[in-house]
Amino acid sequence: MFSSILRKVFGSRNDRLLKKLRKNVDAINALEAEFEKLSDEALKAKTDEFKARIEKGEALDNILVEAFATVREASKRVYGMRHFDVQMLGGQVLHEGKISEMRTGEGKTLTATLPTYLNALSGKGVHVVTVNDYLARRDAEWSNQLFTFLGMRVGCNIPGMSPEQKRDAYQADVTYGTNNEFGFDYLRDNMAFSPQDRVQRPLNYAVVDEVDSILIDEARTPLIISGQAEDSSELYRRINTIIPKLVQQEKEDEEGQEGDGDYTIDLKAKQIHLTERGQLHVEEILHEESLLPEGESLFAAGNISLLHHINAALRAHKLFSKDVDYIVKEDQIVIVDEHTGRTMEGRRWSEGLHQAVEAKEGVRIQNENQTLASITFQNYFRLYNKLAGMTGTADTEAFEFNHIYGLETVVIPTNRPMQRKDMPDLIYLTAEEKYEAIVEDIKACVKRGQPTLVGTVSIENSELISRILKKSKIPHKVLNAKFHEHEADIVAQAGKPGAVTIATNMAGRGTDIVLGGNWQAELEKIENPTESQIEKVKAAWKESHDAVLAAGGLHIIGTERHESRRIDNQLRGRSGRQGDPGSSRFYLSLDDALMRIFASEKMGNMMKRLGMERGEAIEHPWVTRAIENAQRKVEGRNFDIRKQLLEYDDVANDQRKVIYEQRNELLDEGDISETIAVIREDVVSSVVDEYIPPQSLEEMWDVSGLEERMRADFAVDLPIKTWLENDDKLYEEKLRERILNEVVDAYKQKEAVVGEQVLRQFEKAVMLQNLDSHWKEHLAAMDHLRQGIHLRGYAQKNPKQEYKRESFALFSEMLEALKVEVITILARVKVQAEEDVQKVEEQRRQADDVPKNFEHEDATAAPEEASDQVRTQVREGAKVGRNDPCPCGSGKKYKQCHGKLK
């Protein structure tokens, strides 16, 4: 209450920021008349003028007012579109490296041209990041006209381009592309075979469109480049036949009472576990199939791979559903993004899950993958000097943006007041009743000529509603990942009178639904249209537009609540753009996923006791509030998962930075002999210390062992015993120095034979080849460490601290092993001529040329530390769970009834 009084007196931080930015908007508006008088040439010349001023040391902030005025005037001449004052506010927020929340239809694409132009003047490049290839291409083509007019070049970075095309796109002043492609290019550059293979410039400034989708929804899933490992497709097929023989058990085994099922499912955590009975049953089947030797346990150390296959197959069959989590397309499993409903072509699940799904669906099984490089979006986007974002729904996640990315969210007011009417949710007992009510609502909209957008959470649901509408003979269009090629056409006409469009939650996002339909799309169908044809199309559109306005604008129907309030708000936000009228309503049932998890059995019993008849619904603000509270819980849990993923990845990120920095230095250096000399001294000293411990008695020295080791590792025959017999003053330091000198002399002799240039090339090739192979193995070791680290919680240890400690130890061991291997190879290998160097280079290139997968994998952070162990209690009869119905028959939960007495 006190804070709300303070806000009324002093205004919120958001209000104060906007008030400050409005001063610049007034200054830009004051320049408008002056800039209107400039010729096209004079306006274009402004770009060179600004660049010259920046080169002399002038700050971008000092040029902002004139640069924004230049872009506004250029836009008027190129597109006939003038930036509104609210777009000027949004542009300034983006330039300051903040998130600009602008409602759907407020012109985010046009707003982005302002800070993009200003920051591109520095010559360091600007990246505009979009959610898919279609939007990247569309926005690049659209903005190209404006930037070309202003003397700048636009590039587009999409999958499938050659390195030359990518390099050209990155050299442009402004580069449009998808988040995945920018991230993969960064990883590829750090795996480059030579400096010429790199495509990116240093990361300068990024404007992220639909920033919530990219930095939050997709932040739980790291980008991974992987190569294929050994073929185990036959084993996947055989394990696949075992799963249908297993039976699900509803509850986990309890003390003294074992269930009769083989596995249990945890829907919230999306996990599946074998019961004790299930383990024995699986072992029995594996013995019969000759996959497990008689008398051996599934959990024996040698059978870890078999257990891994069983778990993957169980998850594939019981947790992943066709047309919800994936689709089958051209003999391949294509993942469906749970957040956007789009297909993720070329992406694969890790840990053998993808192969298990392939076996389940009977398509060709592709080999398992080995991680070659990986990064999370959190750590990739934090590499930019300045990061900004825009979306229609960021305010609900403002804390996360600030906490993880250091980005402040500024809510920009709408150009015209919002007129959309958001109606309370309707809740039905069953899904069948819910769909009947939805169809009735659609029929009413069609009858009055009101366009309808029906939002679903999965492809399966969108196709179910489509089938129901077909039965009712209602014409409609379906927009989901299966038909994303026609996305723009469907969205363009979704605002026509009486049009019905079914879309998975975020399909079509980024394209406005214009009331009355899109007249420009109609015009494109006519070849070389005449003036009269253009006028005819515009007149027809005006008639449709007015009819839709009279019918109430676009009506949004939500068929289910999403886990996140933000995604529900995005669906609502498709209606009511630019002050247009509109309406929205969500239809729910107790069968919905969110309601199954969070709505208690009590609510269902209460609805039945109220004597609700078929087709009746509950409509009350309390219910809507309860659902939003449930969504808040899920959002909080998802935030914790993302935060935890980041905390674990930060450990790997520090190591990644060190390796990538070293690797890039090696690539750019022509001569690394000084580095090799330093490493050689370290390695020789370590070897000597093993056999002659520092500050030890001569009796403790293993001289013959040291002689043998020097012969084996460094290919030098050193009579160390003779040296010691002949020289009484030859102690540790002097001996170490003499051994090192002998190793260096032997290497110099090799250099004299082979030639300095050849040896320098050989050193670089060996160093890079070994760095890459050791880093690859280290990533696999880190993966394995990560998968089991949560078990340390049972030993009362903090898994995060343990992970940090052990990963540091692994990293140190990897660096030591790398040093030893490089020096011993250089010492032992006989380099005859340049052909030998080329052989090593060829090996490196072959290792680099293996087929790679570019994956945006599902990842879950390692579970938090386990709770403290508690004393075991002996109980008579089965345990009653706190959330189970009370055995007394009251219908209440146990914790609310007799459980209160405990």
Swiss-Prot record:
Checking PROSITE patterns in the record gives: SECA, SECA_MOTOR_DEAD
Q: Name one GO cellular component term.
A: cell envelope Sec protein transport complex
Q: What UniProt keywords are attached to this protein's entry?
A: ATP-binding, Cell inner membrane, Cell membrane, Cytoplasm, Membrane, Metal-binding, Nucleotide-binding, Protein transport, Translocase, Translocation, Transport, Zinc
Localization, per the record, is: Cell inner membrane; Cytoplasm
- Pfam families reported for this sequence: P-loop_SecA, SEC-C, SecA_DEAD, SecA_PP_bind, SecA_SW
Q: Top enzyme class of this protein?
A: translocase
Annotated positions binding Zn(2+): 886, 888, 897-898
Give the span(s) annotated as Disordered: 565-584, 840-902
Q: Where does ATP bind?
A: 87, 105-109, 512
Q: Which GO terms describe its molecular function?
A: ATP binding; metal ion binding; protein-exporting ATPase activity
Task: Quote the protein name from its UniProt record.
Answer: Protein translocase subunit SecA
List the taxonomic lineage: Bacteria, Pseudomonadati, Pseudomonadota, Gammaproteobacteria, Alteromonadales
